[in-house]
């Protein structure tokens, strides 16, 4: 390897905040099912602790061996609605507490999979789990929850959409003392993927192996610095530059995933190519888009800039890694991106523009704070809009919205750490109550019939 490439890698890590955002161990709990909930919970705890006992230590060893920061070590499990559904329990909060205890025991910062897949309808387990989400998130620290309410193959389950509006509202109320932090750990999906390493939407799909390692990379600062070097050049050059940079970032993710896999004795799954920002200066997706020539993210041209970025990252990443997966799209979480926060505060970025950007990236309305008096029906209608974009365009879309109790437009909601700070954004004041009240299913689009 040439000296300048070594120096470039060091600079990417030290100055441009290149890191591995997460090493996530996916663990199947299908063999933990039991008619007795207490027995099932013991099996779950035992399996997670056994499989993930060395996860954090191995992550730290790789950090020191290669000098690559690994920000998070996490776990995803089989959707608990499936596992708990085989028991006679009528409340699943105990399962959430078991996951929380296991996460604390092995030292990971989040565990995902308190989830239900209801794109076409509910099972008994789905009903009980979704009902219990607010209490589960209020009574645990590290558990993340997700619900899939639609897919291109099946359409949108509007009964589930309506219920999720109510669940988000109740979760915000029950975690009001932390400004609705529970809602930051709850994602509503359309076309959810089974191998997502990123929280809060990670769960371990039933088609996955017993245990796998998935890696999520991150490097908005690196991409921005690369684009700075081609100022004023045509978009062809910009796309090529992003592609080459994404190749380097993904190569690092592949290396870390393979080494972790060998050290843990667990198969390597995928690298997720998503560019994930943090609130730190120099680690913003918004600033990449602005470097392309936008005065501020949210102005006209933002969606086109995001399209170029997203596509070029995928093209570069696919060449660098044998198995890519997860969400693999730019993340635009408002509270976790310094450039997004500033754009909202300046009035350049609103919910409608973020919804348009969802057509490009994976999680469009992400870490959005809305006024505390926003109704459950309005939240449900926001979910329906996002799900529709995903279902029609055959892609993953999601909503992570926080109706922080007692807040009004312009207030700031503080979460701290990687979750950052969210300015409370205005929502459309006109009602969607009668629309959401209809329930039923929005049929799958005509182009979903591929067989």
Swiss-Prot record:
Quaternary organization: Homodimer.
Xref: InterPro entries: UPF0210
Name of the featured protein: UPF0210 protein LMHCC_2097
Family: Belongs to the UPF0210 family.
């Amino acid at each position: 390897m040439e000296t300048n490439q070594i120096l470039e890698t060091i600079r990417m890590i030290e100055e441009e905040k290149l890191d591995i955002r997460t090493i996530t161990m996916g663990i199947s709990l299908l063999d933990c099912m039991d008619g007795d909930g207490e027995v099932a919970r013991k099996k779950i705890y035992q399996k997670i602790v056994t499989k993930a006992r060395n996860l954090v230590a191995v992550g730290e060893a790789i950090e020191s061996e290669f000098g690559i920061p690994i920000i998070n070590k996490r776990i995803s499990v089989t959707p608990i609605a499936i596992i708990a559904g085989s028991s006679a329990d009528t409340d699943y909060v105990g399962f959430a507490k078991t996951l929380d205890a296991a996460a604390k025991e092995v030292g990971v910062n989040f565990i995902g999979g308190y989830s239900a897949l209801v794109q076409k309808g509910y099972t008994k387990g789905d009903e009980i789990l979704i009902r219990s989400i607010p209490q589960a998130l209020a009574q645990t620290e590290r558990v993340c929850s997700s619900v899939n309410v639609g897919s291109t193959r099946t359409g949108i389950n509007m009964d589930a959409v309506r219920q999720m509006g109510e669940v988000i509202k109740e979760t915000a109320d029950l975690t009001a003392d932390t400004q609705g932090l529970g809602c930051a750990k709850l994602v509503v999906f359309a076309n959810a993927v089974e191998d997502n390493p990123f929280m809060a939407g990670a769960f371990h799909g039933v088609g996955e192996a017993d245990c796998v390692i998935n890696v999520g990379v991150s490097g908005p600062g690196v991409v921005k610095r690369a684009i700075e070097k081609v100022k004023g050049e045509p978009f062809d050059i910009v796309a090529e530059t992003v592609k080459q940079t994404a190749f380097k970032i993904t190569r690092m993710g592949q290396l870390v995933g393979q080494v972790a896999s060998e050290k843990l004795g667990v198969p390597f799954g995928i690298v997720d190519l998503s560019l994930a920002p943090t609130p730190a200066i120099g680690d913003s997706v918004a600033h990449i888009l602005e470097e392309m020539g936008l005065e501020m993210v949210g102005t006209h041209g933002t969606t086109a800039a995001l399209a170029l970025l997203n596509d070029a990252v995928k093209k570069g990443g696919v060449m660098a890694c044998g198995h890519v997966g997860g969400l693999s799209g730019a993340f635009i979480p408002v509270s976790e991106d310094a450039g997004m926060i500033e754009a909202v505060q300046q009035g350049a970025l609103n919910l409608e523009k973020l919804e348009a950007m969802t057509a490009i990236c994976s999680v469009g309305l992400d870490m959005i704070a809305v006024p505390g008096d926003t109704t459950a029906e309005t939240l449900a209608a926001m979910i329906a809009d996002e799900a529709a974009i995903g279902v029609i365009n055959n892609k993953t879309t999601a909503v992570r919205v926080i109706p922080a109790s007692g807040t009004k437009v312009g207030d700031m909601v503080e979460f701290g750490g990687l979750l950052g700070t969210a300015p409370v954004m205005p929502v459309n004041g006109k009602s969607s109550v009668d629309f959401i009240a209809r329930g039923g299913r929005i049929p799958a689009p005509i182009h979903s019939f591929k067989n």
